[in-house]
Amino acid sequence: MKTLCIILGSLCTFYFIGIAVYAGLSSLFPCIWAAGGVFFYGIAVFLHLNRKHGMLSGFAFPAVLKHGLLVLAVLCVLVFVAVEALIFTGMFHKPSKDLDYIIVLGAQVNGTKLSNSLRLRVERAGEYLEENPEACAVLSGGKGTGEDITEAEAMYRYLVKKGVSPDRLLKEEHSTNTSENLKFSLKIIDTEEDGKGKEASIGVVTNNFHVYRGVALGKKLGCSHIEGIPSKSNTFLQVNYLVREFFGVVKDKAAGNMSVSYTHLTLPTTPYV
């Protein structure tokens, strides 16, 4: 047990260091890996001291408490695995052709430059627009900390520079999170479709780990023809993204923003990563 804790603590610690060196700490979430390292190392030290000095000799946990903690731990693991399985369904989705609209979800902009995650989303959107010339795109994202322009404007400039006609691009520049991305973008589509936006076929373009939540949010808002268009994501950071997305799904479910279902699913041979 002590050896296992040392291994897990080392994995968490080195992954945290890797993230800090490779991508920087633009958010606090990667610190969860540092906390995990401290947690597992702490257990290892405690087990070592207990074995050497008998710190818990003569003490026994009440059976009810022991069994209760075990049941709680198992339930937590089962919930985590179940949510991650749902997230994976979005990662493997193969989008339909000739959708009426695609919604490109915003992500961090550094000044006026797209972050790596956002660039991958916009590149995927550009591919879909090129393959489906009748589709229009709603570029969704407001202006956050460290951003000189809105995320929507940054995406717009990138796609126009790549040759996409401005007539096919609509900007949503007020959202600050994924839920608002979908809500505000659907209002724009509703206006374009004279109040019948929910009848349009819509694709949600985002990094593969984020597709499930984006589509589920759209379904909760009443869209019956909505599906995911997964883009690539950074391979090294994928584990961090998947764990972070677990909390995002749980948060939006608890807030009533989404239902836990995903009915539009196609499984190709390999995921779009």
Which residues are covered by each model-predicted region?
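A structural signal for short, hydrophobic/glycine-enriched beta-strand patches
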Residues: 75, 82-242
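Transmembrane alpha-helices and immediately adjacent membrane-cytoplasm interface residues
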Residues: 48-49, 60-90
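Structural signature of transmembrane alpha-helix termini at the membrane-water interface
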Residues: 14-24, 78-89, 126, 250, ...
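Membrane-embedded alpha-helical segments of integral membrane proteins
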Residues: 1-52, 242
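Conserved small/polar residues in nucleotide/adenosyl-binding loops
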Residues: 263-269
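Lipid-exposed faces of alpha-helical membrane segments in multi-pass integral membrane proteins
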Residues: 7-14, 72-78, 82, 243, ...
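A transmembrane-helix-recognition feature enriched in membrane-embedded lipid enzymes
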Residues: 242-260
